[in-house]
Amino acid sequence: MSAKSRRPGTGSSQTPNECVQVVVRCRPMSNRERSERSPEVVNVYPNRGVVELQNVVDGNKEQRKVFTYDAAYDASATQTTLYHEVVFPLVSSVLEGFNGCIFAYGQTGTGKTFTMEGVRGNDELMGIIPRTFEQIWLHINRTENFQFLVDVSYLEIYMEELRDLLKPNSKHLEVRERGSGVYVPNLHAINCKSVEDMIKVMQVGNKNRTVGFTNMNEHSSRSHAIFMIKIEMCDTETNTIKVGKLNLIDLAGSERQSKTGASAERLKEASKINLALSSLGNVISALAESSPHVPYRDSKLTRLLQDSLGGNSKTIMIANIGPSNYNYNETLTTLRYASRAKSIQNQPIKNEDPQDAKLKEYQEEIERLKRLIGPQQQQRSEKQVTAKKQRVKKPKKETVTKEMSDSLQVSTIEQPVEDDSDPEGAESESDKENEAEVAKSNEELERERVENSKLAAKLAELEGQLVRGGKNLLDTYSERQIELEKKLVEIAERKKREIEIQQQLELQEETTLEIRERNVSLEQEVELKKRKLSKCYAKYLALQQELNDCKSDHNQDLRELEMAQNELVKELKRQLLIIDNFVPIEVKQRLYTQAKYDEEQEEWKFSSMSLPTPPGGDGKFSSKRPVSHPQRRRPTSEYALQEAKSNSPSSLRFKSENIVNYELEMPCRTTQEYRTPKVSASLQAVLAQAMQTGGDDIDIVDSHTNSLRSRLENIINANANGGAGPGAGVAVGSSIPNVRNIKSSRGLPSAASNLDSNRRPPTGRLPAKKPASAYPKARGLVNK
């Protein structure tokens, strides 16, 4: 057997820096898109590795966007073609000792899970992951003089938390970093010995994976799944160890809430998915622009992909897109990120003689067990031989003792007994000692046999985990199949070189045409300049459209980030509301002061060692639930107290007891409030005018005095004309000057009082006469 046939894989030991290989795959039109008659906007040219995207709304052929990749596959491409042309060389490099990574990227519902896993029970539709299993074990079975150790793990990133899909009830995992790269401690790994074992592990993990329904996909993946394969290989001749690691990643698709119709829990999942994918896009952009800072720590996904993007790994990015105009914006975004990822350079290094190789530990443990078992088996055989000898000697002693006893009996008959010692008792004691030694040796042998059986079982278990190559070659695959695989690899390499050459020719086409063309006349030169001008103008329009698209995408990203920020703010307010209403103030202050942010795990933690001692004196915090009021049995918020006071049906759940509270019913009122009488507007105006102060008051008094004088004179004249005799007339006449004198001396008030005294009351009755002593008699009148 040649050296080449004994080596695992066919790749070279030293490789220069290489870029991430980007492949685009377009799915066929779905039944829903056909029923809605949505036009196709994607044209794929597999021979050139070109994807052309056209906006149907614009309709201008010059506005078509063209993207070039390492390979492009349309809807007619099969799973077998994709695997043999793209994935097969990468898996061969992993079997050589390199790190490899394959991840599917794109919008939800574009066929990422179909590309990675395929359809169960259908060999033609089998995805990349199960085909990888077959290639690995085919290589192990036909490689001689090598020992292999294959371990697999399966995890998912759900809501920015790492979960072990092989142990669904385990605690959340953490991401750590060391000199060799990023790893996940406490991740459960299963040792596999065949293709069937690896398929069973994948099926168990898929059952535990989170899947949901959306308007875009009935079986939408709600988490990022990572299937890890670690292959350790040891050359039995040179005793060199190589380790190859392969990460197969099925990313969740980016979503827009308006299209997926996500709500409640699905909306939270979509926000976390979009956040992780946007972080991945930022990492790709930073690596493409050779930025000094790459934001790997923005999400758990980018941290796990740190070695695959810009690290020690060979990486393939499969961008899945949809052909419909309905997904134009998402398709354009995916193609742009994929185009940027082409310029990312990795530094793959072969992992030779690693310090953490389990294969080396297993070999050392096997040698130690063999050294323990070897001497014990030799001692066991020696003890068995001695035990057999003792069993053989025992009957001889019995015959000898019988002969001796016979001779002693004869001697006792012939001679008197001189000694009282009994030889038979001494022989029986020696026999008992021999039997005890034999029983003891048998117990030791049985105990050593049990220990040897345990060591042998452990040795068989360790040797069973190590798979030796070069067996069952004729039973699994024939020589023709091996040659066919080699030819397929050569064809894939040749096709890849043809695509690269075709792309280089297209880039140099413009320069070669300018060199070859010779201007014969001015008209041809003008025509040539016009064509150049039209091309430059088309490039200008394309760049301008690209700039506008970038602005719109940036605005869309800002709006999505604002929505995510609003959701986070609402969640924060809800948490703060709970803390303010249900957590005691001293506990809240203590938690705020002791909270620290762990950048490694990206979460807040509390230092239990630095927490203050509680006032109880026993050094322990009370486990009793805090109360908001001493008279209440449980913490109650202000809103619950207000609702408990009302008797509405919705407030029954806030009541601690099944008692309806009613208010006191008061009797009806028998009195009314006093209301002031209404005053007419005209009277109100007169009163307001009368209440005014100023020079008008004097005029009013003068006019009133004049009116009283005129009325008084009329009354006096009437009384004078209606007199009954001379006495009366004289009396009346004599009273006139008296009245005038009174008027002149006492003024208007006295005259008014006399006038009022002569008036009749409103009832028509005369007023009662006053007694004479009421007023003093006049002492005479004085003429003017």
From Swiss-Prot:
Give the compositionally biased regions (Basic and acidic residues).
429-449
Compartments, as annotated in UniProt:
Cytoplasm, Cytoskeleton
Which source organism does the UniProt entry give?
Drosophila melanogaster (Fruit fly)
Q: Which InterPro entries match?
A: Kinesin-like_fam, Kinesin_motor_CS, Kinesin_motor_dom, Kinesin_motor_dom_sf, P-loop_NTPase
Name where it mostly resides. Answer: cytoplasm
Q: Where is this region: Disordered?
A: 371-449, 605-652, 742-784
Its biological purpose is as follows:
Plus-end directed microtubule motor that may be used for anterograde axonal transport and could conceivably move cargos in fly neurons different than those moved by kinesin heavy chain or other plus-end directed motors.
Q: Which GO terms describe its biological process?
A: anterograde axonal transport; establishment or maintenance of microtubule cytoskeleton polarity; microtubule-based movement; sensory perception of smell
* Compositional bias of kind Acidic residues: 416-428
Please give the superkingdom of this protein's source: Eukaryota
Expression across tissues is: Expressed primarily in the central nervous system and in a subset of the peripheral nervous system during embryogenesis.
Binding-site residues for ATP, renumbered to this chain: G106, Q107, T108, G109, T110, G111, K112, T113
Q: Which SMART domains match?
A: KISc
One cellular-component annotation, GO: kinesin complex
* UniProt domain Kinesin motor: residue ranges: 19-344
Stretches assigned to coiled coil: 351-385, 426-582
Q: Gene3D superfamilies, alphabetically?
A: Kinesin motor domain
Report the protein name in the record.
Answer: Kinesin-like protein Klp68D
Please note every region of biased composition (Low complexity).
Answer: 769-778
Q: Name one GO molecular function term.
A: microtubule motor activity
Q: Per UniProt, which keywords does this protein have? A: ATP-binding, Coiled coil, Cytoplasm, Cytoskeleton, Microtubule, Motor protein, Nucleotide-binding
Query: Family assignment?
Result: Belongs to the TRAFAC class myosin-kinesin ATPase superfamily. Kinesin family. Kinesin II subfamily.
Q: Where is the composition biased (Basic residues)?
A: 386-396, 622-634
